[in-house]
From Swiss-Prot:
It comes from Human adenovirus B serotype 11 (strain Slobiski). GO terms for cellular component: host cell nucleus; viral capsid. Induction: Expressed in the late phase of the viral replicative cycle. The tail region anchors the fiber to penton base capsomers, whereas the shaft, built from several repeated motifs, allows the knob to protrude from the virion. The keyword Phosphoprotein does not apply. Keywords: Capsid protein, Host nucleus, Host-virus interaction, Late protein, Viral attachment to host adhesion receptor, Viral attachment to host cell, Virion, Virus entry into host cell. Belongs to the adenoviridae fiber family. It holds the Pfam family Adeno_shaft. This is Fiber protein. One of its GO terms (biological process) is adhesion receptor-mediated virion attachment to host cell. Homotrimer. Interacts with host receptor CD46. Interacts (via N-terminal tail region) with pentons. All late proteins expressed from the major late promoter are produced by alternative splicing and alternative polyadenylation of the same gene giving rise to non-overlapping ORFs. A leader sequence is present in the N-terminus of all these mRNAs and is recognized by the viral shutoff protein to provide expression although conventional translation via ribosome scanning from the cap has been shut off in the host cell. The lineage of its organism: Viruses, Varidnaviria, Bamfordvirae, Preplasmiviricota, Tectiliviricetes.
Length: 325
């Protein structure tokens, strides 16, 4: 059995148990001291066991906090020490980014929302030139236009291209005969034929009313794009520049020119061409219209009665002031 060291008469039994005569801490280990959470040095000093993030620096038990944490002076709660600067916003315990016009998220990634007329090319934003073009395609595979009143089906191909260039539209047009009835026009000395195009308020072709029976669409390679167009108003002739039913400005609604038909003997026959913009609306559905008339009056017919060939007019280009988008 081990005997304890005899304490001096000047021992103070109150912690820290100093000997008043020597100011020394005798080594004692009373039964009421547990080593859990405490430690006692050989000289009898009782201290707390502190592991990170706890510390007693400054004399009191403290929690070490990094740059992103702080202790609330009001309630003593631990909270994040994070502020947000514009355009970031802090709401509660979250940081967010308000999204303005043109921005969105896709698969939890910030992205740019591209509207009509813009596209990505090798991760760069560029202008989609195709939407500046409205056309029938380079050469439709089948007849797309019915011009002859006597025709029960489409009798020719109308190739039409409309390109927006600033405040103007550049138009490019010609016809290719398909039916024998249409091609026989070349055997007449005096003839005219008209392609009528009627459009609604958004610039969509009214195929039921128009000579052209297939809708126009944007350019996709050498073909028409797929899907319906939402707004082609910017391709239409301006109703301010070319008003409807205004006899005082009738001449301003017409464009005149010449194209040619090359006969089978290689003779070039001139064809008068006139373009009427708006001018007359046939019903309430019609907001815009373009009428293109080809005519000739020659001493001799381009072809003889027995040798009618495909009627192909040379391309004709004209310009007009366009409607606002």
């Amino acid at each position: 059995m081990t005997k304890r060291v005899r304490l001096s008469d000047s021992f103070n039994p109150v912690y820290p148990y100093e000997d008043e005569s020597t100011s020394q801490h005798p080594f004692i280990n009373p039964g009421f001291i547990s080593p859990n959470g405490f430690t006692q040095s050989p000289n009898g000093v009782l201290t707390l066991k502190c592991l990170t993030p706890l510390t007693t620096t400054g004399g009191s038990l403290q929690l070490k906090v990094g740059g992103g944490l702080t202790v609330d002076d009001t309630n003593g709660f631990l909270k994040e020490n994070i502020s947000a600067t514009t355009p970031l916003v802090k709401t509660g315990h979250s940081i967010g980014l308000p999204l303005g016009a043109g921005l969105g998220t896709n698969e939890n990634k910030l992205c740019i929302k591209l509207g009509q007329g813009l596209t990505f090319n090798s991760n760069n934003i560029c202008i989609d030139d195709n939407i500046n073009t409205l056309w029938t395609g380079v050469n439709p595979t089948e007849a797309n236009c019915q011009i002859m009143n006597s025709s029960e089906s489409n009798d020719c191909k109308l190739i039409l291209t409309l390109v927006k260039t600033g405040a103007l539209v550049t138009a490019f047009v010609y016809v290719i005969g398909v039916s024998n009835n249409f091609n026989m026009l070349t055997t007449h000395r005096n003839i005219n034929f008209t392609a009528e195009l009627f459009f609604d308020s958004t610039g969509n072709l009214l195929t039921r009313l128009s000579s052209l029976k297939t809708p126009l669409n944007h350019k996709s390679g050498q073909n028409m794009a797929t899907g319906a167009i939402t707004n082609a108003k910017g391709f239409m002739p301006s109703t301010t520049a070319y008003p409807f039913n205004d006899n005082s400005r009738e001449k301003e609604n017409y464009i005149y020119g010449t194209c040619y038909y090359t006969a089978s003997d290689r003779t070039a026959f001139p064809i008068d061409i006139s373009v009427m913009l708006n001018r007359r609306a046939i019903n309430d559905e019609t907001s815009y219209c373009i009428r293109i008339t080809w005519s000739w009056n020659t001493g001799d017919a381009p072809e003889v009665q027995t040798s009618a060939t495909t009627l192909v007019t040379s391309p004709f280009t004209f310009y007009y002031i366009r409607e606002d988008d």
